[in-house]
C-alpha cells in the first residue's frame, strides 16, 4: 500500500521507520526527519522484532499523519519515483528478498497449514 498525506509530495513530509538494521542503505529514519530528495527502494529489518511496529509519514504543513502498523519482521519501503513522489510504498514482509536462497526468516508450512499476516493503515 502507498501512504500519502492528501497527495502532497512526500519530499515535504517527515518519515519515521521502525528499523534496527538496514540491509541496503546507510540512511535511517529512526526519528522523524524530512524525506526531502531521499530515494528509498530498500528492505529493512524491523524493530522491535516480533512486536507491533509503525511506519509514520507526517505532513507538518497539513498537521496530519498517515501510518501503517504491523508485526512482520521485514519491511519494504519505496519513495514512489514513478508516481511523482506522491506516495510512499510500505510493504510488511515475512522475509527479506532472496529468502528462498538465503533461508533467512522463511516460514515453512506443511500441507494444509496456513500463515496469516495483518496490517493496519490509518490517519491522524
Question: Where are the model-predicted features located?
Answer:
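Active-site/ligand-binding surface loops and adjacent short beta/alpha elements
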Residues: 1-70
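Sterically constrained small-residue positions within well-ordered secondary structures
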Residues: 48, 68, 81, 108-110
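Beta-strand secondary-structure signal
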Residues: 54-56, 89, 116-120
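Glycine-rich active-site loops that engage anionic ligands at enzyme catalytic sites
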Residues: 56-97
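Short Pro-Gly-centered flexible turn/kink motifs
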Residues: 108-124
Amino acid at each position: 500500500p502507498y501512504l500519502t498525506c492528501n497527495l502532497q509530495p512526500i519530499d515535504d513530509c517527515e518519515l519515521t521507520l521502525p528499523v534496527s538494521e538496514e540491509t541496503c542503505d546507510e540512511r535511517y529514519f529512526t526519528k522523524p526527519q524530512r524525506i526531502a530528495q531521499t530515494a528509498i527502494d530498500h528492505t529493512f529489518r524491523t524493530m522491535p522484532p516480533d512486536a507491533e511496529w509503525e511506519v509514520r509519514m507526517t505532513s507538518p504543513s497539513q498537521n496530519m499523519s498517515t501510518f501503517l502498523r504491523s508485526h512482520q519482521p521485514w519491511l519494504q519501503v519505496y519513495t514512489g519515483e514513478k508516481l511523482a513522489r506522491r506516495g510512499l510504498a510500505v510493504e510488511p514482509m515475512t522475509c527479506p528478498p532472496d529468502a528462498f536462497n538465503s533461508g533467512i526468516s522463511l516460514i515453512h508450512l506443511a500441507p494444509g497449514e496456513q500463515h496469516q499476516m495483518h496490517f493496519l493503515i490509518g490517519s491522524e
